[in-house]
Structure formats: C-alpha cells, structure tokens
C-alpha cells in the first residue's frame, strides 16, 4: 500500500514540477556576449569566454536558416530559440539542397552561379542575420556550405 502511494506521489510531483517549469519564458540574452570572445580552454575540453568563464554550448541546427527564411521569419525563429535557452545556432551560408540560385528574399546568392562572385545583397542579408543573433545573445556556428 505504501509503495503504491509513494509511486503515485512521485509521479504526481514530477508532473507538477515539469508543468510549472515550462510556464516561464527566458527573458535575458541567451549568452553573455559582454564576457568576451569564445576560446578553447587550456585543457582542450571545453569552450570559455575570454575572461575564463565556461561557456555552455546549447546548439540548435538550422542549416538553411539564412537562405530559406525571410527577415520576419528569421526574427521569430531566433527569438523562439533565445526564449528556449539556446546559446548557439548552427547554420550554413550557401545551402546545397534544392537551389543555390535565389534566397527566400528573392536575391541571388552568387552572381551567375559563380562561387567566386558572391552577390553583395545576399551577403548583406547574411550579415544582418548574424547581427540579429548577436543582439539576442546567440552565437552563430557558421559553415560556408
């Protein structure tokens, strides 16, 4: 009898605490960018800020974030991830899947599809996404393609 009651009580408490923990949204920046740049700790085992404070890498992978989402969608996505406590967004500049020609904003990514001729408008958009992430305290783990 006591065992059954204990199990029920534990399950009930688990449900209560799990539900209440999901009510509060994160209100601050995801990471404290004022602590300096990131570097590998001298032990080689983890990342830290330049002031020596350990950095917790909680990443979300959005490979085609830059090329698929427009400005409004990007703002919503980054805000959603900031609220959830992510610290890093992993993405690429040039996606390899469907088309590499045009971004979601309708701008070409490359001039004449030539990798040696980046389109200035698209790369202004790339800079904007990175700046928006930084304003929210999110780091961007960026791959070229």
What are the residue ranges of the model-derived segments?
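Bacterial Sec-dependent N-terminal signal peptides
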Residues: 1-23
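Active-site mouth of glycoside hydrolases
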Residues: 26-145
């Amino acid at each position: 009898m006591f065992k059954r009651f204990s199990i029920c009580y534990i399950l009930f408490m688990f449900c209560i605490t799990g539900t209440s923990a999901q009510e509060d949204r994160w209100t601050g920046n995801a990471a404290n960018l004022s602590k300096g740049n990131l570097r590998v700790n001298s032990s080689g085992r983890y990342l830290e800020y330049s002031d020596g404070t350990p950095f917790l890498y909680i990443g979300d992978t959005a490979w085609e974030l830059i090329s698929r989402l427009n400005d409004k969608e990007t703002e919503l996505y980054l805000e959603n991830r900031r609220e959830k406590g992510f610290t890093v967004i992993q993405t690429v500049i040039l996606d390899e899947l469907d088309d590499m020609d045009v971004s979601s904003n309708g701008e070409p990514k490359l001039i004449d599809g030539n990798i040696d001729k980046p389109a200035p408008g698209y790369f202004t958009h790339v800079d904007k996404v990175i700046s928006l992430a930084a304003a929210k305290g999110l780091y961007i783990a960026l791959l070229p393609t």
